[in-house]
């Protein structure tokens, strides 16, 4: 049994802007999670072309340890707490597959994302079979709703309800910001439709871990997109060439931080 959920994240940015904003924010967020031998290691970041699809391919290793629950940490052997993330970014469509060498085909997280210029109103954008779609839970993430943020994750400087962009004039986002977007002719909007498939086959732990993973994915999507909006002025003027240069520099920094910095970022047992 696999657990499927679709997360919809509406943002006051355009689909074109988001391409740059997402890559900028991924690079920055990676640094916040790396240190003490843990965090992100970038193995490959290169263009790809396959079956008529063109985009950017990345292969990363996440060294987790403190970022997985204690009950898994106690059962898993040394080295089993690394996960491999392979992503094919053929924007505006992106597919990410996360695996683990120890668990092989018994563990999978697949994230398929369509970025669309709408307010999250499309149904079955990933074109699943009607019978499969019927069982998918749809979850709306509101980046301005503080009640969706864990208190330990909250940072005032990353709160869209308080942030105002100097360069674009967007923000702060009030309680009805999504309804107001429709009438704001000068403010673009989009929705990231993220279909997440989770498979974890381990007798006695399957449901517990699959639910834990979805909880963490929702937490990641919420925190990440709050940051992305509140970092708007840092990335809105950047080009894709700027981003590629920044990614090269980030890879070097991550390698250094993993060795020299203390453990930091989200942990599972908070």
UniProtKB/Swiss-Prot annotation:
PTM annotation (N6-acetyllysine): residues: 215
Predominant subcellular localization, coarse grouping: cytoplasm
Disulfide bonds: none
Keywords: Acetylation, Cytoplasm, Lipid transport, Lipid-binding, Nucleus, Transport
Pfam families in alphabetical order: IP_trans
Subcellular localization(s) per the UniProt record: Cytoplasm; Nucleus
Assigned protein family: Belongs to the PtdIns transfer protein family. PI transfer class I subfamily.
Function recorded in the entry: Catalyzes the transfer of phosphatidylinositol (PI) and phosphatidylcholine (PC) between membranes. Shows a preference for PI and PC containing shorter saturated or monosaturated acyl chains at the sn-1 and sn-2 positions. Preference order for PC is C16:1 > C16:0 > C18:1 > C18:0 > C20:4 and for PI is C16:1 > C16:0 > C18:1 > C18:0 > C20:4 > C20:3.
Protein name in UniProt: Phosphatidylinositol transfer protein alpha isoform
Natural source organism: Bos taurus (Bovine)
Gene name of the encoded protein: PITPNA
């Amino acid at each position: 049994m696999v657990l499927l959920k679709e997360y919809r994240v509406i943002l006051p940015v355009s689909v074109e802007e988001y391409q740059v904003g997402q890559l900028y924010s991924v690079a920055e967020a990676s640094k916040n999670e790396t240190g003490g031998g843990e965090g992100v290691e970038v193995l490959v970041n290169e263009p790809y072309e396959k079956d008529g699809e063109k985009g950017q391919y990345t292969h990363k290793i996440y060294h987790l340890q403190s970022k997985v629950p204690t009950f898994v940490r106690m059962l898993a052997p040394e080295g089993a707490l690394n996960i491999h993330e392979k992503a094919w970014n053929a924007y505006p469509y992106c597919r990410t597959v996360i695996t683990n060498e120890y668990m092989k085909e018994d563990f999978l997280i697949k994230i398929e994302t369509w970025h669309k210029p709408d307010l999250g109103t499309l149904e079955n954008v990933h074109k699943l079979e009607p019978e499969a779609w019927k069982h998918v839970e749809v979850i709306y993430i509101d980046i301005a709703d503080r009640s969706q943020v864990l208190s330990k994750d909250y940072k005032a400087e990353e709160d869209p309800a308080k942030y105002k962009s100097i360069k674009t004039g967007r923000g702060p986002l009030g309680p009805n910001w999504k309804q107001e977007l429709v009438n704001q002719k000068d403010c673009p909007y989009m929705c990231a439709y993220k279909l997440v498939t989770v498979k974890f086959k381990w007798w006695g732990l399957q449901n517990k871990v699959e639910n834990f993973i979805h909880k963490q994915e929702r937490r990641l999507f919420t925190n990440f997109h709050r940051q992305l909006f509140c970092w708007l002025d840092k990335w809105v003027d950047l080009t894709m060439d700027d981003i590629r240069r920044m990614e090269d520099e980030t890879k070097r920094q991550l390698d250094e931080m993993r060795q020299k910095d203390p453990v930091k970022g989200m942990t599972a047992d908070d």
